[in-house]
């Protein structure tokens, strides 16, 4: 029954955003309900962002689909996500990338996300409790880096951990609004490849809790 609901959810997403076949397949493979807190299970297959603990949110599935597709997913191997949250975005990425690395700074969210991902048998997803601004140097460089929270700027540590020619997608705070930008690394520096759309994400915060 859930897979039918998930399929219908993807139909709704595709009406609003033309899904790459790989992204659609990935979205249909991961049941969003698994990542939604119990009080909101009946909203799991809507296109709404839903509240979690610690003043955090599980992103709208439309947003997850867009952010995944904005990474330009063909012919890539590894991705680093900054801000694991519920684990839903990482789970979707796991259906496309061979290796997924995700960092979460809130320990309670990290513990829950890791358990969900393990329960689903997503062995290619690796989750770390740490400050995402420092990245995950052990497995660098990454073909892609995705911010699942809004940054004021991109830390040098993450630029260093991105493969030359690699792509980084992030919501960026600009004055009083947020915009999703796609960057490409050229000559060891990030260049804005495209400003994609306005958005609303929780902010990137330093440190752990």
Swiss-Prot record:
<dbReference type="GO" id="GO:0030091">
    <property type="term" value="P:protein repair"/>
</dbReference>
<keyword id="KW-0808">Transferase</keyword>
<dbReference type="InterPro" id="IPR029063">
    <property type="entry name" value="SAM-dependent_MTases_sf"/>
</dbReference>
<dbReference type="GO" id="GO:0032259">
    <property type="term" value="P:methylation"/>
</dbReference>
<dbReference type="Pfam" id="PF01135">
    <property type="entry name" value="PCMT"/>
</dbReference>
<comment type="similarity">
    <text>Belongs to the methyltransferase superfamily. L-isoaspartyl/D-aspartyl protein methyltransferase family.</text>
</comment>
<comment type="subunit">
    <text>Monomer.</text>
</comment>
<keyword id="KW-0489">Methyltransferase</keyword>
<keyword id="KW-0963">Cytoplasm</keyword>
<protein>
    <recommendedName>
        <fullName>Protein-L-isoaspartate O-methyltransferase</fullName>
        <ecNumber>2.1.1.77</ecNumber>
    </recommendedName>
</protein>
<comment type="function">
    <text>Catalyzes the methyl esterification of L-isoaspartyl residues in peptides and proteins that result from spontaneous decomposition of normal L-aspartyl and L-asparaginyl residues. It plays a role in the repair and/or degradation of damaged proteins.</text>
</comment>
<dbReference type="GO" id="GO:0005737">
    <property type="term" value="C:cytoplasm"/>
</dbReference>
<keyword id="KW-0949">S-adenosyl-L-methionine</keyword>
<dbReference type="GO" id="GO:0004719">
    <property type="term" value="F:protein-L-isoaspartate (D-aspartate) O-methyltransferase activity"/>
</dbReference>
<dbReference type="GO" id="GO:0036211">
    <property type="term" value="P:protein modification process"/>
</dbReference>
<feature type="active site">
    <location>
        <position position="59"/>
    </location>
</feature>
<dbReference type="InterPro" id="IPR000682">
    <property type="entry name" value="PCMT"/>
</dbReference>
């Amino acid at each position: 029954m859930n897979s039918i609901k998930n399929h219908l959810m993807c139909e709704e997403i595709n009406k609003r955003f033309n899904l790459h076949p790989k992204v659609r397949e990935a979205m249909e493979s991961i049941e969003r309900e698994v990542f939604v807190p119990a009080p909101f299970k009946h909203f799991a297959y809507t296109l709404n962002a839903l509240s979690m603990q610690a003043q955090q949110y599980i992103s709208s599935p439309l947003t997850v689909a867009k952010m995944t597709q904005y990474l330009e997913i063909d012919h890539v191997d590894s991705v680093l996500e900054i801000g694991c949250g519920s684990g839903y975005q990482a789970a979707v990425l796991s259906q496309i990338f061979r290796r997924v690395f995700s960092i979460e700074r809130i320990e309670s969210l990290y513990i829950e996300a890791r358990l969900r991902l393990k329960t689903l048998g997503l062995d290619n997803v690796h989750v770390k409790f740490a400050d995402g601004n420092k990245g995950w140097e052990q497995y660098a460089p990454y073909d892609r880096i995705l911010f699942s929270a809004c940054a004021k700027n991109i830390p040098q540590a993450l630029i260093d951990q991105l493969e030359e020619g690699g792509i980084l997608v992030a919501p960026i705070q600009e004055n009083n609004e947020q915009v999703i930008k796609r960057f490409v690394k050229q000559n060891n520096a990030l260049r804005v490849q495209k400003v994609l759309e306005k958005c609303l994400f929780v902010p990137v915060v330093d440190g752990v809790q």
